[in-house]
């Protein structure tokens, strides 16, 4: 076969400089630098890209990485270019605080929009401290931080007018009001994820925001140290709370049709009226939701509570996704008995109950008469088919049923 002659000039190199820089911005800085050997046209393009995406493992040490950042930033400053995105995978074991703060201050002043710092070391003494300039970055839109420390700021110096997304994992806050201050001074914040450092000793996590649409909290701390949680975000469309044993969980306001995922655990003790009152308030707040995903350990806590106090009516609940993984069927009916208007039910099981268990703990009549959709996520066994048959015969309004594996 005859070989087709190829032009010495590729079409990609004919593109305007700003388009080539946009293409390079989707690569890591290391990969972007490698393109400099393609041709004279590409030799300097990587240095014009508005993104720095660095991995400490690509350098001999922090000094070399620091010199690279300084050189890149100085060149950008000479040309009057903005740095839109700064991503750093970092080893705080080799960390020098003052040079780090100085460089991060430069990044903030260059009008950064996306800031992502991942410290690979999560021990307390190696956490990276954030500079004060970060609290008043007018251009910042997305803030993603792993294993860092926020010192207590002066409230008047905090202003994050453009931030829409915050993701904090393994983060320590120097004082209960630090996180609340960051949230309250971010007027357009839409998405917030908080996974505190296991050795962070916050007593209160307070989320008050008029603009927030999505909030996820996952606590990995020891149960005796878990904080109080308060939510007041009327625009919230999605909320996920995973906290082993929160001191308290108060939900003042969220969006009327928010999808809520709850994975919490409470101690139910007959001789502790304060604990019983706390659980009651939590359940009353939970009863206002329309769509709810609930974990096995939360169902177990509700089941235990039902033995010592009445459950509130969940008349607003129309959709429920209930997990019984590593749990038993008997914990579910107590909660279902309060769901008089339930329209959609998803049950996740790792062990399908036998009919004898269901007869001892039957599905309440209010659910059998209101249910329109049912999905059973469980291993394929004869018991699963019997459970499906049970629902099909008992449910008077059921129009759709799905059977699936886990």
Swiss-Prot record:
Pfam families: F-box (PF00646), FBD (PF08387), LRR_At5g56370 (PF24758). It comes from the Eukaryota. InterPro entries: F-box-like_dom_sf, F-box_AtFBL13-like, F-box_dom, FBD, FBL13/AtMIF1-like, LRR_FXL15/At3g58940/PEG3-like. PROSITE patterns: FBOX (PS50181). Residues 9-59 form the F-box domain. Residues 355-405 form the FBD domain. This is FBD-associated F-box protein At1g60410.
